[in-house]
Amino acid sequence: IFGVRALLVTAVSVVACVAFEWLYCKLLKKANLISDLSAVVTGISVNLEYVKVKYNTLINSDIVVREFTLTARNRQYSAFLLFIDGMVDSTLVNDNILEALMLRNRANIFDGNQNQVISEAKTNNITVRKVKKFDLDTYISDCLLPQNSVKKINSFKDAFDGVNVGDCLLFVDTLEIAYDIDVKGFKQRSVESPNNEVIIKGPQEGFVENIRTNTSLLRRIINNENLIIESVEVGSLSKTQCCICYMQDIANTDLVAEVKYRVSNLKIDALLSSGELQQLIEDKNNYTIPQIISTERPDKAAKHLYSGKVVVIVNGNPYVLIMPATLTDFIASPEDSNLKFQFANFSKFLRLISIFITFLLPGLYVAISDFHQELLPTELLFSVIASRENVPFPIIFEILLMEISFELIREAGLRVPSPIGPTIGIVGALVLGQAAVSANIVSPILIIVVAITGIASFAIPDFYFGYHLRILRFGFILLGYIAGFFGIAVGLCIYVTILCSIKSFGVPFMAPYSPITNINESGFFLDPMWKREKRPDYLNTKRQNSQSHISRTWKYK
């Protein structure tokens, strides 16, 4: 008896082990199949399981998998939707997808009991009908999905890319494809006035974080079919969508190809802003000089597109990039084209003066005070000496202390809430300057120099170019302290040499002055509107003329 029991126990154990091993191998094989799945298969259960595994639906609370049944030709098909809650328009999903698939198809939208008649002919009293065999794929796309954008895809990679940007996926049993339905509906900021590029006369619209809204703003200004907007994905994880915009009949082909090449050949995990892209595609990153224009104004971007340049828009960022850039671009303001050329040129002249004041005035003050006092009139020299009589610190310490303090006040004004930011800047500068003079830490003349320098820096229209000049200012302060005018002259020679050596996407940064080309078309100052006949020649555009030689034909009739 005990031997029989032992034999039975052994047999049961062997059978259990074999069954367990068979079940384990089957589950492992299924798991490997699911993990290695790359294309949509006909089995709806396999697709469903793969989707749940890839999106971790047991953990992710915003991933929605909606299973339902679709009826066609008196047959029921299992189906499911996949989308991300909060990124789709729930009304579109309910009314245009679920209702159409679950309810409308049962109201004989397509005659499911008969094939579709293509043509009918009668010969010898015999009717001959050509019919089209029922196709579930065509039936769904043509009759059941009243959505303007529906794509058929068979790759899970493409399917997941669509879901991640706000699309909805439809999987149906027996079909080796999935339907990518555009039902984006996430919240976004409305179009508002630009915050950092304010103008008095001109459009008051700015770019936003949504890339399609930004491209539509450009399309609304440029009503031309030659405006090309190409999409490129950057980032292996973020898959950030970037749009490369250019005028096909104007922009230089080599320039467009170079921009595409640089943007497309970035091997990074994530791209989050246009500022990151700017650093990745600039020619020389070691210099603080910006080589790409950044703007939040659609009218400014459109103007550069008309001139033959290329614009790159990054999804999720309200600033677009314009390339190539020259020195004259950073002195220009979007308001210049809206003003008479006399007013615009006067403003540009003030900006040129403010540029030199921003990075040269403190260094010149240090050089004159330490090395070249003989250049000052006698009365002014006595006044300077008297103001510094009770100051115990050397002039280099004074000016560095005040310049750094001014930069701290400016930075603090940017970081605090906007209603009190300007107040902190003004009050802080007044209180700090008065207290420093009263305590004999700095001289009153130095306060005037620092204040004029700070005001001049605010007159520079481009924020990044102004930042560059603010950093450059400290270098010239040190040169003026070390070697006076000679040090400043050497610094200027080196600086101009660097400017002349820089190229932005093949275009010299100092164009049209180095090398000298047609200065009248793209120099610092503007010609009258009716004389701006040509585009910048350093861009080598396909169409050089921007208007007729006689644009005001009414004057000669």
Spans of model-derived segments:
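Hydrophobic, aromatic-rich alpha-helical transmembrane segments
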Residues: 2-11, 341, 345-352, 388, ...
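Generic detector of multi-pass transmembrane helix bundles and their immediately adjacent loops
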Residues: 364, 380, 392-557
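Core alpha-helical transmembrane segments of integral membrane proteins
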Residues: 344-411
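Membrane-embedded alpha-helical signal segments
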Residues: 2-360, 378, 498-557
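Flexible, active-site-adjacent loop/turn segments at secondary-structure boundaries
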Residues: 181, 189, 198, 205, ...
